Structures are given as C-alpha cells and as structure tokens.
C-alpha cells in the first residue's frame, strides 16, 4: 500500500516556512558544533520543493479515527533545498598564503586572534532512504523515528567551492551534522510543528512567548546619535552640525561616507603600510606583517651604503691592467698614481651588475717585478761598477731590515703591487759566473792575474760582496776549498766590514791536519784558473772569439712583460 502526499498546502503557507526555519535554526545551534564554526548557524531559506517523498507501508500496528501507528519505508529524491549562514574561523597564515603569489602577499608573520569569515552554505539534492516509525495522534501530534541512517547523499555548495580542500572538509562536516540531525533533532522538529497545527492551546502559548521576547528587545540604537568630531562627506568637505543633525538612517544621503578625517588618515596609512603590489590586499585584524618589520631591518643596513657612491662594474676593474709595464720609472709612477683613484671602491667591485661569476676563465696576468733600468744599472752591466756611490751610502743593504721602499701606495685591487724599488741591483747569471771565476782565481792563486789587476779595487770589493750574497747557481759541487789561516788573514775580501745590522756567522774552522790535501787542492785550483785564463786570452794575446765574449759580457735585455 502506498500514499500520495498533497504538497501544495505546505508550499502555500508562508507561516509554516517561517516557523520551520526557526525550529531548524534552534536545532542546528543546539548540537555541539565543530570548532571551526565560531558563530550561530542561521537558516535563511527553506524550500521543500514540489516532489513529495515515497512511503511504503510495511506494518500497521494501530489504526483508529484519531490515532495511527505504522512502520514505513521512505525514499526521497526531490528538489528541496536549505540555505545556511554562519561565520567560520580561518587561518590567514596558511590558507591566504597558498592562494596568493609572493609579490602580492603582505606576508603575515603572526596572528594574535582568529580570523572570522562569513560562510553561506546551500544544501540540495537530498537522497534519503530508510525505515520510519510513524505515530499520529490529534492530542499529541506526529512522532517520527528513524530506525537507520536515512541520508545517502547530498550536495553542499559554499563560498569556498574554489578551494578544494575546504570544499571537501565542509562536505564531510555537514554530512556528519545532518546524520545527527535526522536521528535526533528532526523528530522533535516535526513533533513541534504538528502540535502547532492541531493543538490550539500550544499555538496560543507559543504566540504569547514570542510577543514578550519582542518587547524585551526594545528599539534599535541610532548610530548617528553621537556624530564624530570632524565629520566629512564623500568629497572630503567638512560638514556643519546642522547638516549632521538632518541626516537620518532613512535619508538618501550616503551614510557610509560620514567618517572622521583622523580615521581616514589612519586607514590610509594602514593600507599603505602593507607595501604590496596588489591593489586589493585584504586587511587582516590582529596580524603582524613582514613588511612592517622589514622597514626597521632595512634602516640599519641603509646607513652603511650611500646611494651616491659609485659602483664599479667588472669591465672597470681592468683599468689598472691597461697600462703596459714598460721599463720606465715615470710610467710606473703614473701606473701607481692612476690605480690609487680606485682605492675607495675596492670592496664594491663584486656589487655591480654581474654579481655571479661568468663561465669564462679568467686570464692570468704576468707582472714584471724587476726594477726599471737606471744609469746605475748601466754602469754595473758594463763592468765598471756594480753599485753607484749614492747607492752604496744611502740604500739599505740586504743585511738590514726592510724599510719603506716608496711613499706611494698602490691600492689597485686588480693589479698586484710592484716589487720594492730597491737600489740594490741583482746581477745576471753571466755576471755571477764571471764573479765566481774571479773569486776562484783570487782564492787559488797568490798572484793576481792581468784581468784582475786591470779592474779597480772598488769593483773587486763589490764583486766579492755579491759573490758572498748570491752564490753561483752554475757552480759544480766540489769538496770544501778553504784558504789557510795565514792567507785568509791577508786577504782583503775576507776583512770587508759589514754593517752593524748584518747577521754575522762564525768562520768555519779550517782543517790543517793534512798538509798533502791542502797542497793538492791548491795545485788543482791553480791549474783550473790557468786553463780558464788561457781560453779567454789566446796564445797571441787576443781573444779567439771576441763577439762571443762581448755578447756574454753584456747584460741581456729582459723580455717585455706579458699582456693579459
């Protein structure tokens, strides 16, 4: 057996829907709500639709004129819908940042209070199927009890449909609430509605309670009762007290433009303080933004750099290396003077347009660290003298501590500084070979040769000092050859006076125990010196290869410094 319901009287009665909305609102707020919902749930719209449910009688227990009791199987697949409004708490530090790009986000750091967002939910496309126990009585109304969970599915449409995880969460939460509603609250709501329809006493008692509630609430407060101190209109013009008094809630004047000028300035400053590129950045209450703290952090770092200070690029760092290292003292002084102009910006070389290194390999620069030629060097090369008279008196020797070699400071961060401008000349390999040969001759022979007699005494002294300082790199390792103590005492080279700052070592103790060894060594040294002298001077008294010896007597011109 089946029943056909006439749904038209329910749709025609406007009071029925109003009362049903109030009952549903009270039922939804009565049950424990999830913590995300921070406001009351209000039913704003209710419509049962035009399709009634289907009931199938399974059992009839009691049947009379004023009462009925039976068990039914109910199924519903209609067009009823329900609209709810509430406020939910959102987390601005998580949901807002996920849905916004980084350049348009105010970047909140912390929130002291929760953010409440209005939420509108529409429930539609109900699918119900279950067993219902129905009891009807004119004195007690209608009682409906579900033996199982009737809710199969429904559609939830909300404000957050564009956010997938919020939509899924609301779907699950509302389905859980509706299951509890059908099992507990819906039978009570149906019972109260039936009492209002069939029991007049209950209807009168309920109307009296509603009237007393309206009287206790009283009239609403007028927000214009206390106007601001300096009101302005929408154009920013100040308003007189008479114009403010003429305004009312029902007038056509724009009430929303009536704000204090101080409040407008504060709101403008608050909007500008977020410092984002988005034109519609929402304001979140009790939230600290990163842009607010960044201004104080940048304040300290701005004091270190000046906006007017120039920034050198990578191309400008090669200016110091454009000068060629010519053996000229004026050129080198100009080089050091030109490079000192960049001493103030040495730390800013990496802060130009190219902060990252390029893939191109850096070129290695070969810097000529040799001292430029002077007239003193030319004299030393020709063999007349190794040191000039000025250098011998004023220049520091190799035995003293290094002094300030130049007053000019080379602060070029790219080109390394030149070698100290010593007045002490480093002899070439040929000079040191000639000096070592002369030393062997003086050491092995008691009578000086013709070439040694021709040289001045100052040249011999200088040659001896250089021979002691720079040993011959081409000398063949031999046994120790030392002069006897008597010859060493008479030798003027060994008694040369050294400066006071020189590090003097005690002379080695000669080994005089074997006279035969000394005689053999003296004979070998004299023979070697004689052969070398005969090779230089031919049998006829002239050199056999004058061009060869002249070329080796002159100092070789050092090659120019390599470019970069």
Curated annotation (Swiss-Prot):
<dbReference type="GO" id="GO:0000002">
    <property type="term" value="P:mitochondrial genome maintenance"/>
</dbReference>
<dbReference type="GO" id="GO:0008289">
    <property type="term" value="F:lipid binding"/>
</dbReference>
<feature type="region of interest" description="Disordered">
    <location>
        <begin position="208"/>
        <end position="240"/>
    </location>
</feature>
<comment type="subunit">
    <text>Component of the ER-mitochondria encounter structure (ERMES) or MDM complex, composed of mmm1, mdm10, mdm12 and mdm34.</text>
</comment>
<comment type="similarity">
    <text>Belongs to the MDM34 family.</text>
</comment>
<keyword id="KW-0813">Transport</keyword>
<feature type="region of interest" description="Disordered">
    <location>
        <begin position="404"/>
        <end position="423"/>
    </location>
</feature>
<keyword id="KW-0445">Lipid transport</keyword>
<dbReference type="GO" id="GO:1990456">
    <property type="term" value="P:mitochondrion-endoplasmic reticulum membrane tethering"/>
</dbReference>
<feature type="compositionally biased region" description="Polar residues">
    <location>
        <begin position="477"/>
        <end position="503"/>
    </location>
</feature>
<dbReference type="GO" id="GO:0015914">
    <property type="term" value="P:phospholipid transport"/>
</dbReference>
<feature type="compositionally biased region" description="Polar residues">
    <location>
        <begin position="209"/>
        <end position="219"/>
    </location>
</feature>
<keyword id="KW-0446">Lipid-binding</keyword>
<feature type="domain" description="SMP-LTD">
    <location>
        <begin position="1"/>
        <end position="208"/>
    </location>
</feature>
<feature type="compositionally biased region" description="Polar residues">
    <location>
        <begin position="438"/>
        <end position="462"/>
    </location>
</feature>
<dbReference type="InterPro" id="IPR027536">
    <property type="entry name" value="Mdm34"/>
</dbReference>
<comment type="function">
    <text>Component of the ERMES/MDM complex, which serves as a molecular tether to connect the endoplasmic reticulum (ER) and mitochondria. Components of this complex are involved in the control of mitochondrial shape and protein biogenesis, and function in nonvesicular lipid trafficking between the ER and mitochondria. Mdm34 is required for the interaction of the ER-resident membrane protein mmm1 and the outer mitochondrial membrane-resident beta-barrel protein mdm10.</text>
</comment>
<feature type="compositionally biased region" description="Basic and acidic residues">
    <location>
        <begin position="366"/>
        <end position="376"/>
    </location>
</feature>
<feature type="region of interest" description="Disordered">
    <location>
        <begin position="336"/>
        <end position="397"/>
    </location>
</feature>
<feature type="region of interest" description="Disordered">
    <location>
        <begin position="532"/>
        <end position="564"/>
    </location>
</feature>
<feature type="compositionally biased region" description="Basic residues">
    <location>
        <begin position="351"/>
        <end position="365"/>
    </location>
</feature>
<keyword id="KW-0496">Mitochondrion</keyword>
<feature type="compositionally biased region" description="Low complexity">
    <location>
        <begin position="380"/>
        <end position="390"/>
    </location>
</feature>
<keyword id="KW-1000">Mitochondrion outer membrane</keyword>
<feature type="region of interest" description="Disordered">
    <location>
        <begin position="434"/>
        <end position="517"/>
    </location>
</feature>
<dbReference type="GO" id="GO:0032865">
    <property type="term" value="C:ERMES complex"/>
</dbReference>
<keyword id="KW-0472">Membrane</keyword>
<keyword id="KW-0812">Transmembrane</keyword>
<dbReference type="InterPro" id="IPR031468">
    <property type="entry name" value="SMP_LBD"/>
</dbReference>
<keyword id="KW-1134">Transmembrane beta strand</keyword>
<protein>
    <recommendedName>
        <fullName>Mitochondrial distribution and morphology protein 34</fullName>
    </recommendedName>
</protein>
